Amino acid sequence: QKALHSSKISLELFQDFLEKDSLFLNNRYSIFLFTFLALILGGLSSSDTPNDVWYQELNKSFLNPPGYIFGLVWPILYFLMSISAYRTFPNTRNLFLLQLFFNAIWSWIFFAFHLPLLALVIIWLLIGLNIKLNIDLYKLDKLSAILFIPYVVWLFFASYLNLFIVVNN
């Protein structure tokens, strides 16, 4: 219950942050900074994954790629996401930042706190948010929607990997 209350407070603070008429938030270049910060925060939680005994002992899918693949894929996806968000700024800013927030906390929930079931719920939420975001992007700028598709596809793949771990461990 305490964790739920903390999550509610965090989301309320995040919402207040988004609603502020901030020059920084209304600057389309800030989207690159937020994307970079999310990449760094997510990376910090999983930087020790190859040496993490908990992760190594999990039963993983035969489709689970080697760790270096994640290190190659995520920066590319973040780059494509940030270009997409930049092209449609500020129309999709709030939804983009919200999904970015959940993307960053997924890594912490899964890798740092070892809560794969909660991480699975978060990734399903991420998929829903990003389908909605991609629909919005398509209405505004078709190229932005196309740039976002690899991320959505990767989220489906990541949710499969996450589900496999939940079911088989």
Q: PLM ranges: what are they?
A:
Residues 7-10:
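Intrinsic disorder
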Residues 25-45:
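N-terminal signal-anchor transmembrane alpha helix
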Residues 49-62:
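Membrane-interface helix termini and inter-helical loops of multi-pass transporters
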Residues 60-72:
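Short aromatic-rich membrane-water interface segments that cap or initiate transmembrane helices
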Residues 74-85, 99-102:
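Core segments of transmembrane alpha-helices
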Residues 108-118, 168-169:
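Membrane-interface helix caps and helix-loop-helix hairpins in membrane proteins
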Residues 137-153:
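Interfacial loop-to-transmembrane junctions
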Residues 160-169:
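Juxtamembrane boundary at the C-terminal end of a transmembrane helix
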